[in-house]
């Protein structure tokens, strides 16, 4: 299966100096092949305007980016129960809306650890689709972010289109989930579940930001 995103695509959305790549020796020896390609060749966005905030520990010292921390180093590691086997070795990528973003090195699956809930939720099938989602959100930013555009004619349409494109690339994050703007489900109801991470991002797009 062909990759969804490459370095040229990411550089068309983010400044090249804001795309972090890792030396191979700083990555685990046993790392899913597609994830390794993303981390060594494509890069992760390190941009304050991005919905993804990379783990700050990656940039301590002069030889950054550093090796990734693992979930075993989380402050509240002992509070997590009934987690997938081997999760303690997952790499900590960063955060989105206070949810910790992690990478299962064996399968290449991206998980989030929802803030305060001490569980794992599958965020993307692969690091490739995760990074592709960050690309889509950034390339469409002029159509929903008033800090880069004076006029935003249809942020709602942009959000709807983005969600459809994301589903085509990786349906996993959206399975059984109504969008934030759905009239069929009330996300603000007292008994409503927590809105999944990518739908929170798309809710921001829908409402426009800046």
Briefly describe each language-model feature range.
Residues 86-118, 122:
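A contiguous binding-surface segment within folded domains or other stable secondary-structure elements
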Residues 4, 25-29, 120, 124-127, ...:
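Generic detection of long, well-ordered alpha-helical segments
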Residues 135-179:
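An amphipathic alpha-helical core segment
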Residues 1-101, 168-210:
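A surface-exposed partner-binding patch
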Residues 111-150:
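Compact, glycine/acidic-enriched structural inserts
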Residues 110, 130-132, 156, 181, ...:
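A ubiquitous, low-specificity "background" feature that marks scattered single residues
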Residues 55, 89, 120, 153-161:
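Polyanion-engaging groove/track-forming segments
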């Amino acid at each position: 299966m062909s990759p969804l995103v490459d370095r040229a695509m990411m550089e068309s959305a983010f400044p090249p100096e804001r795309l972090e790549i890792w030396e191979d020796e700083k990555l685990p020896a046993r790392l899913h092949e597609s994830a390794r390609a993303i981390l060594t060749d494509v890069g992760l966005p390190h941009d304050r305007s991005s919905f993804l905030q990379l783990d700050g520990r990656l940039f301590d010292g002069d030889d950054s980016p550093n090796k990734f921390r693992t979930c075993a180093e989380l402050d509240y590691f002992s509070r997590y129960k009934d987690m997938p086997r081997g999760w303690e070795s997952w790499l900590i990528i960063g955060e989105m809306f206070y949810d910790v973003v992690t990478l299962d090195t064996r399968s290449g699956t991206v998980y989030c650890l929802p803030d305060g809930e001490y569980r794992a939720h599958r965020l993307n099938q692969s690091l490739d689709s995760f990074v592709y989602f960050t690309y889509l959100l950034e390339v469409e930013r002029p159509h929903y972010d008033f800090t880069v555009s004076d006029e935003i004619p249809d942020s709602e349409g942009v959000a709807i289109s983005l969600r459809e494109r994301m589903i085509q690339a990786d349906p996993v994050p959206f399975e059984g989930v109504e969008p934030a703007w759905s009239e069929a489900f009330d996300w603000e109801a007292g008994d409503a579940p927590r809105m999944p991470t990518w739908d929170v991002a798309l809710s921001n797009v829908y409402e426009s930001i800046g």
